[in-house]
């Protein structure tokens, strides 16, 4: 079948069909005269692609589906969440999604409407592309950027599927081989499709460690930042973390690499053939570059604890006092360093996900505050000065620059708790159980425009890092403001206020705020509340997969192709 016949049959333009072939979604045979010959299988694949694209599924996600890295159900759940957050905008697509599973699985498309593909063709890209990979706690993401044209070309996200069930409920571990295999498959898909990749950058979940042997192979699971073993009682009812502080005067939180290693040493859980340890992103870099010993960026090394940020070295005296100097410590750099190559593509040293997210979300590092409100919340700003603070964490960024970071345990989660409260009342009234975010958001906006004095909400449902025993409170309630809308607005102000309390007085020299995170996107009034509190303009970032984007930009800088 010729391309003109395919176009007439399924309503796709020639440009779109060739674009899908360019992206590797179809592989079309050619006749002896060089003309493409489309088979029934090609037409079926194009019908599937068109159907998925009309439902709003991205080209990169379709690629993952065809490569068997995600299931159709994975894509549908992801798309439904996207649509629910922008329900009015995507109402017609929501109807399509609801009927999609049966139609797709039975190859029933019957699409007569034409569809115009708007994605960027490879031919429009420069030869200065970079890839970023982010190994997150639940997903692995990748993004491709064109540094010359300053665009984010394509993004991919898959479930990491690496969690390992262990007997002790305080332990939280993942399989490093599963994580690396999936990350490498993503990189292979990208490098097969894009021939102008000049750099690969890596980031991922900080604090956690994986033990390695002398050959650079993992000899343990990844013990993640969510692990709570160091919070268990040690002696005299103090925790392992408490004991670290008593012996060294250094605070190392549970889930941090050295707190985990301390627990493992005392309880004989360090594998016999352990030589060193590293983060999961460092381990991926080692596998990509076929190196055997970890080189850590300072942003990652600091996340383990017991690290001298100014001197760029581990605190060996404190480590010796704890009796845990039984491994060879990784090397550390604060430079834009190329560790090695993967398929002749330079691979930069891995950086921490907080730092990568900052780089990926913020254009002007020195003038901008980043407020990220997801399940928790985090506020970050760049400083050139070295300063330590009890409520703020100082983290290395790049040479001679640091991030001052304040983190709250319950950001958007607080709003979710409120939504669950309202939904339970509605369900008890025999109405269908469904999300009530749209209704609450409308009430919050109405309350905001009224400008009344709202109830004061301290959303400490999970305590504070400095005091885990704290509880949430609601006060300043009056007859006038005790309404669902005013209460919900109080929650929004409480969430934003906790972020402001970390850095507010220090923000006078900054010019703008970049807001990111699902809560900011799902609660429209939050942008205005943040702006009111800080007295600065707020822009909600449209960047996708900010940590992966930041890793790509870091790698691009490492090879000299970053124009920013």
Region locations from a protein language model:
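Short, charged amphipathic alpha-helical surface segments
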Residues: 50, 64-121
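Core-facing hydrophobic residues within beta-strands of well-ordered domains
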Residues: 197, 327-329, 510
């Amino acid at each position: 079948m010729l391309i003109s016949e395919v176009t007439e049959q399924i309503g796709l333009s020639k440009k779109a069909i060739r674009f899908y072939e360019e992206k590797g979604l179809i592989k079309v045979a050619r006749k002896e005269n060089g003309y493409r010959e489309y088979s029934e299988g090609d037409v079926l694949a194009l019908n599937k692609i068109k159907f998925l694209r009309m439902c709003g599924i991205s080209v990169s996600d379709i690629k993952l589906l065809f490569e068997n890295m995600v299931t159709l159900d994975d894509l549908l759940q992801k798309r439904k969440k996207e649509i629910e957050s922008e329900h009015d905008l995507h109402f017609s697509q929501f109807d399509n999604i609801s009927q999609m599973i049966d139609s797709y699985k039975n190859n029933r498309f019957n699409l007569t409407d034409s569809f115009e593909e708007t994605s960027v063709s490879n031919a429009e890209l420069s030869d200065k592309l970079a890839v970023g990979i982010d190994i997150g706690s639940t997903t692995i993401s990748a993004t491709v950027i064109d540094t010359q044209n300053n665009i984010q070309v394509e993004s991919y996200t898959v479930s990491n599927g690496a969690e390992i069930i262990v007997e002790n409920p305080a332990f939280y571990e993942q399989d490093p081989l599963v994580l690396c295999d999936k990350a490498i498959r993503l990189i292979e898909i990208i490098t097969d499709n894009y021939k102008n990749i000049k750099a690969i950058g890596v980031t991922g979940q900080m604090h956690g460690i994986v033990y390695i042997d002398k050959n650079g192979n993992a000899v343990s699971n990844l013990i993640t930042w969510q692990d709570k073993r160091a919070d268990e009682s040690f002696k005299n009812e103090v925790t392992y973390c408490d004991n670290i502080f008593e012996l060294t005067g250094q605070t190392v939180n549970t889930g941090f690499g050295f707190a985990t290693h301390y627990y493992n040493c005392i309880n004989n859980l360090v594998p016999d053939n352990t030589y060193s340890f590293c983060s999961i992103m460092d381990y991926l870099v080692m596998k990509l570059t076929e190196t055997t010993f970890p080189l850590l960026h300072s942003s990652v090394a600091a996340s383990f604890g017991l690290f001298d940020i100014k001197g760029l070295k581990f605190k060996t005296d404190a480590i010796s006092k704890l009796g845990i100097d039984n491994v060879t410590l990784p090397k550390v750099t604060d430079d834009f360093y190329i560790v090695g190559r993967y398929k002749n593509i330079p691979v930069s040293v891995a950086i921490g996900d907080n730092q990568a997210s900052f780089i990926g979300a913020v254009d002007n590092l020195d003038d901008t505050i980043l407020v990220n409100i997801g399940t928790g919340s985090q506020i970050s700003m760049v400083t050139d000065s070295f300063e330590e603070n009890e409520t703020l964490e100082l983290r290395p960024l790049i040479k001679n620059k640091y991030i001052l970071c304040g983190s709250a345990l319950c950001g958007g989660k607080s709003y979710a708790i409120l939504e669950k409260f309202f939904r339970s009342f509605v369900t008890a009234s025999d109405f269908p159980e469904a999300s009530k975010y749209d209704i609450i958001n409308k009430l919050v906006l109405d309350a905001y425009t009224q400008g009344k004095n709202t109830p004061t909400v301290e959303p400490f449902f999970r305590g504070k890092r400095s005091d885990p025993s704290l509880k949430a409170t609601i006060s300043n309630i009056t007859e006038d403001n005790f309404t669902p809308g005013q209460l919900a607005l109080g929650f929004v102000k409480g969430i934003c206020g906790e972020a402001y309390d970390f850095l507010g007085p220090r923000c006078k020299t900054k010019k703008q705020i970049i807001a990111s995170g699902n809560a900011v996107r799902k609660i429209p009034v939050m942008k205005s509340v943040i702006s009111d509190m800080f007295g600065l303009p707020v822009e909600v970032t449209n960047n996708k997969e900010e940590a992966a984007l930041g890793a790509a930009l870091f790698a691009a800088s490492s090879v000299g192709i970053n124009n920013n």
